[in-house]
Amino acid sequence: MQRIVTVLCLILGFLLLAVLVAIPAHNVTPALAQEAPKTASPAEGYNIHVLAPHLVDGKQMGPYHHYCKVMAPDPQIVCLIYESTEPNAVLSQVEWIYAKKMTRAAVPLKEWNKNWHDHAVEIAGGRVQVLDLPPDKAKEVADTVATTDGMIYHFYFDGKLPNGKTSIAQAVGHKPLTESEYKASGK
């Protein structure tokens, strides 16, 4: 009896596989996928374009193209970061940006000095460019971001494949803060 059940399961499995192989995948191609009806998704809205170099393993690299999205008005921002503006550029970093009042209240100074950076310092260093916006709007973006701290995750690749390694990249010009500077600047 058990052999009959096993044989029937195998037959049903092969029939199911044959049916799945016979069903066309509606000829889905990248071009057709782009033409599909658009619905709201988390991937929309990364349209603030910023250019800035980073320190990766202590070496200045980039400049990197940040495509940023405001997630909350206090502000909370996420940036997808690429080495170029090519349509198929590889995502090489992600930056989380939060209002100083949030980070300074929650992150211990030692951890902040190691992993976070102050955008006011980075912007004042003159290496950050807000692209694709008129000068008055670019200044507005820079002024808002100057009220925040950022943490950048860098992804490592072996050739074209990610290897699973990450590190915290740092802003060029990052300055560790003293306890009193940290407390005073988080208000």
Give residue ranges: language-model regions.
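Bacterial N-terminal signal peptides
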Residues: 9-25
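Cleavable N-terminal signal peptides
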Residues: 25, 30-31
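Positively charged n-region of N-terminal signal peptides that target proteins for export
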Residues: 1-4
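Primary mode marks residue(s) on the alpha4-beta5-alpha5 output face of response regulator receiver
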Residues: 32-80, 86-187
